[in-house]
Amino acid sequence: MKKFLLSFCIVSSSLFIFSEDTVSDIFKPNYKNQLFMDVEVALAEAQSELEIIPLWAAKEISSKANIKYLSQKDIDEEHKLVRHTLVARLNVWKRSIDAEAAEYLHYGATTVDIWDTVLVLQIKDSIDLLIDDLLEIEDYLLTLTKDNLNTYMPGRTLGQHALPITFGKKTSTWLAENRRNIERLQHVQSKINKSGILKGAVGSYLGLGDMAIETESLMMQKLGLDEPSKDDWHGIRDVFAEYALTLAIVSKSFGRIGNELTLLQMTEIGETEEYLGSRSVGSSTMPQKKNPRGP
C-alpha cells in the first residue's frame, strides 16, 4: 500500500527513517525563529494601526523580519549572557533595526504572550499538514474500497475463520476511522485557532494600554488566527492536551491498519502484499523474506 502518514516526532534521527521531514521542520529553530518575528511584526502593525506606536517604526520592524537577521549562533551567544530565550532573540534582532524603531519592538507584550502564540502557530501549521495528508489518504482508501467490493476473503473472529467478507468491507472500516480522525483534528483546530494570546504578564491586559483587547484581536487577525478567547489560558494547557490526545488516536488508527496488513502478509496467509520496489530487501541474511514496510 502507499506510504501513509507524516511524522509528528520533532526529533531528527535515523530511527525515524520511514517518516517525512515536513512536520518536524515546523518545530526546528529557524522555523520557530521566523514565527517569533512574524508574531512581533503582527503586534507592531496592529499597534501602529491603532496609533499606539508610530507607523514608521512598525514598517522598520517589518522590513527586518527575516531569518537572515536572526542567526541561531548569535542567539546562542547572547543567551549565554542574558539567560533568557526571548530577550536573547530580541537583542540579536535589534542589531539590524533602526535604534529608534527598536524601542517599539515587543511594546507592552510579555514573553509568554509571544511564545504561546508561536506554539499556537506551530500547532496550526502541523494540523494543516496532517489534515491535507489524511484527505489524500481518504481519497486513496475510497478508491481501494470501491475496487475491492467483490474481493472475497475470510472474515475472522479471534483469529479464526468465521464468515466470508470482502476486502472492501475491511478497508471501509479504515476509511470511516480516517474520516473521524479528520473531523477530530478539525474540531481541535477550531480551538487552536482561537488560542492566540496577548494578555500581559498575569493575563489581565495590564501594560498593554486602553486598547489592549483591540490590539490582541487585530494582531491575531494578521496572523491568520480567529478572534481570540478572552480568558487567560497561559497556565491552562487543556487545548494542547486535546491536540496530543487526538494525535494519539490518529497514531493508534494507523497502528491498527499496519498490524492488520502485517498479519495478512504472513507466509501462511498471504492475502495482502505491498509492492516496495524491485530492489527492496527483506532481510540481510535470508533472501526468501519479503518483510512488510513497518520493520
Predicted features along the sequence, with ranges:
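Residue-level micro-sites within transmembrane alpha helices that shape
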Residues: 2, 112-115, 259
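Classical Sec-dependent N-terminal signal peptides that target proteins to the secretory pathway
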Residues: 2-14
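A helix-coil-helix interface module used to build multimeric assemblies
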Residues: 14-191, 195-199, 203-205, 209-218, ...
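Acidic, glycine-rich loop-and-beta core segments that form the ion-binding/anion-interacting portion
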Residues: 216-295
